């Protein structure tokens, strides 16, 4: 499957505005493609910080709720120009759970620059079910 990264970035730039970030204003949006279907998620902060939901896990929940189990592509959009943005450890483990060897992950900054990773580059020697 060929992806239109320009279109995906435009979608994520619209979706990221829905993030609920009253504490950090660090907005993140995620788009997952699984079996040619798209699933979106945004980060949702909570005053009880451990209850906060990351955009990646939000998108995974949408995908699983729709009956899908294997991620083909992950696009994570950050509202900063940090150049070193990437999923947190908890999200990396969640992404690994539903990824396969060919899963591709893109980390995109708000200037549309991006870095591409494989799941193994993102979480080397991650814990996997047998």
Swiss-Prot record:
UniProt: Zn(2+) binding residues: 54, 88, 91
UniProt-annotated catalytic positions: 56 (proton donor)
Biological process annotations from GO: cytidine deamination
PROSITE patterns attached to this UniProt entry: CYT_DCMP_DEAMINASES_1, CYT_DCMP_DEAMINASES_2
Top-level taxon: Bacteria
Coiled-coil intervals, chain numbering: none
Cofactor: Zn(2+)
Domain CMP/dCMP-type deaminase: 3-130
E.C. code: 3.5.4.5
Keywords: Hydrolase, Metal-binding, Zinc
Catalytic activity reported: cytidine + H2O + H(+) = uridine + NH4(+); 2'-deoxycytidine + H2O + H(+) = 2'-deoxyuridine + NH4(+)
Note describing how the cofactor binds: Binds 1 zinc ion.
Binding-site residues, substrate: 43-45
A GO term, aspect molecular function: cytidine deaminase activity
One Gene Ontology CC term in the entry: cytosol
Function (record text): This enzyme scavenges exogenous and endogenous cytidine and 2'-deoxycytidine for UMP synthesis.
Assigned protein family: Belongs to the cytidine and deoxycytidylate deaminase family.
Subunit organization: Homodimer.
Protein name according to UniProt: Cytidine deaminase
């Amino acid at each position: 499957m060929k992806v239109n990264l320009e279109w995906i970035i435009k979608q994520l730039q619209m979706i990221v505005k829905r993030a609920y970030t009253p504490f950090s204003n660090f907005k993140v949006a995620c788009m997952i493609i699984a079996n040619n279907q798209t699933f979106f998620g945004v980060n949702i902060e909570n005053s009880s910080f451990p209850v906060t939901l990351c955009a990646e896990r939000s998108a995974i929940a949408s995908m699983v709720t729709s009956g899908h189990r294997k991620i083909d592509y992950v696009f994570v959009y950050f509202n900063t120009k940090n150049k070193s943005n990437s999923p947190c450890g908890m999200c990396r483990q969640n992404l690994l759970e539903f990824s396969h060897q060919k899963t591709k992950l893109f980390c995109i900054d708000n200037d549309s620059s991006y870095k591409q990773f494989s799941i193994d580059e993102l979480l080397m020697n991650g814990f996997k079910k047998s």
